[in-house]
């Protein structure tokens, strides 16, 4: 990884170097994996990757908020959001890597 952000291209390159598949095959593998995760979330399923974490779609209720420009009350519609909770293994790994 070159910068502070891991990209799809970085993932593809890492898979290519580790597994030895062609770059094109690695790109397809990474894309298919991400598609499977997205499809599961679209269906409202929870995606659990052991040792990594859990992606989950949650429903948020409608609520009253404020228009930041006018300060007037405004209703915020109900919506769905994606949450991620890192596993204990991942949290410990990050703590070790970042000196925490």
Swiss-Prot record:
GO biological process, one term: regulation of translation
SUPFAM superfamilies, sorted: IHF-like DNA-binding proteins
Listed HAMAP family: IHF_alpha
Keywords: DNA recombination, DNA-binding, Transcription, Transcription regulation, Translation regulation
Family the entry assigns: Belongs to the bacterial histone-like protein family.
InterPro entries in the record: Hist_DNA-bd, Histone-like_DNA-bd_CS, IHF-like_DNA-bd_dom_sf, IHF_alpha
Summary of the function given for this chain in its UniProt record: This protein is one of the two subunits of integration host factor, a specific DNA-binding protein that functions in genetic recombination as well as in transcriptional and translational control.
Quaternary structure note: Heterodimer of an alpha and a beta chain.
Annotated disulfide bonds: none
Highest taxon of source: Bacteria
GO CC, any one term: cytosol
A Pfam cross-reference name: Bac_DNA_binding
Annotated PROSITE patterns: HISTONE_LIKE
Keyword Ribonucleoprotein set for record: no
Keyword 4Fe-4S: no
Name of the protein this chain belongs to: Integration host factor subunit alpha
GO molecular function, one term: structural constituent of chromatin
């Amino acid at each position: 990884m070159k910068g502070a952000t891991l990209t799809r291209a970085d993932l593809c390159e890492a898979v290519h170097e580790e597994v030895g598949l062609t770059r094109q095959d690695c790109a397809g593998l990474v894309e298919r994996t991400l598609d499977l995760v997205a499809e599961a979330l679209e269906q409202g399923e929870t995606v659990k990757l052991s040792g990594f974490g859990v992606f989950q779609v949650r429903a948020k209720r409608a609520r009253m908020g404020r228009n930041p420009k006018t300060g007037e009350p405004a209703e915020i519609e109900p919506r769905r959001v994606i949450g991620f909770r890192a596993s204990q293994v991942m949290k410990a790994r990050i703590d070790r890597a970042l000196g925490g």
